[in-house]
Every structure is written in C-alpha cells, then in structure tokens.
Amino acid sequence: MILFFIAGSQVMSQIPSGYKGTPYKDSVYQTGAQNIPGRIELAFYDFGGEGIAYHDTDTANNGSLLNRSEGHCRPGISESICFFRENEGVDISYTKDWADFNHPNKTDPKVNQLYIGWQEDGEWTNYTVDIKVKGRYRIVTIYGNHDNGSTLWLNHTKLTDIKLPEDTGNWHYWTQATVAETTIEKTGLNLLTLKYNSGANLAYLDFILIEAID
C-alpha cells in the first residue's frame, strides 16, 4: 500500500505496482482523480498514452477528425470541446444540435457532452479514481445505440459487466439506464478500467451509493 498526499490530505493507494498512468487534469475540465461516489467522465481517462492509459486499434482520434470536417465544430463551440485530446487515439466527440438534439431522446444528454465513440472490440481506457466509501453501488450511464459487452475492472480484477438494456436504434439517440450494481470493498486511489467492444456511444458512469459497508 502506498500513501499519497493530495491537497494536503493523506490518501491510500491500491493502484497496481508499476502502473505509469496519471489522473487526467487540465485548466478547463478536471483536476486529478475522479471520485466514487460520483460521475466518471469517460473522456477524462488517464494520461500515459497507448498501452498504459488506453488501448485503441488505431492512432487517430476519429471524433476530432470528424470535427475538422465542415459543419462539425459548431459555431460558438470552443476548440477544447471540438478537438478534445485530439492527438491521442481514443475517439472522442461531443453532442451537437443537429445530430443529438434534432429528434426526441428518451433522455437528453448535456449540451456539448463529451463521449467516447467509434469503439472497436478489445479497446479500453484507464481511470485513476478516489473511492471515498466502501459499499454497494448502482451504476448509471447515458448512451446511444446498443449493448457492446463492456466490463469494468478494478485494479486488474473484474468488477462487473456493463449491460446496456435497450437498443436505441441510432448512435445519436440517447437514453439513460442503470447498467450494473456492484460492491466495492476498497477505498483510496484505485485503477478503474473500462473494457469495451463496438456498438455504443458512452458518455459517463455515475456511481451512486446504495449502502455503505464497513
């Protein structure tokens, strides 16, 4: 077990020895490890690059490539959204007026919500998370399209399957759903891995505490 000091507080680390990734942070979106309970924004995967913080089957960020096309970086939208993490391989885009809000959604995503798309079988992303409470958790996400056989892993041990219960019929037709319930028996800094296959646009994972445990 390793102790870290974050913002003056001592935090235990359960992160596997030898992991070289570090929590995502920049001046706009995020400062350090994401918290559980709380929302894990999937675009905020760790720094560290291919094979460490993520695995993608090609080197291009296909979301940024698309958003370089005419009409895809919408008027008034900052480049920090249109071309988020443009030089990395994970494929990230954002919700747009003419693609995501020009039809009824069962649940509307946030305007300019970043999401991971263009997924291929065997890809994954890593997240340094700070687990505040041991307990039973409900996991909720907002997604478009259909189930893609995702799984969540904690410190290289499988935590749960992620089951997207409904086929929305389109990558840009969004709904929100409970996709798993699981028990987390660790606190402090931990390594959360999302492994996914082709089939869905995924925006975030909300970890909602059902019941704390000792």
Regions found by a protein language model. Name each.
Residues 14-214:
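Extracytoplasmic
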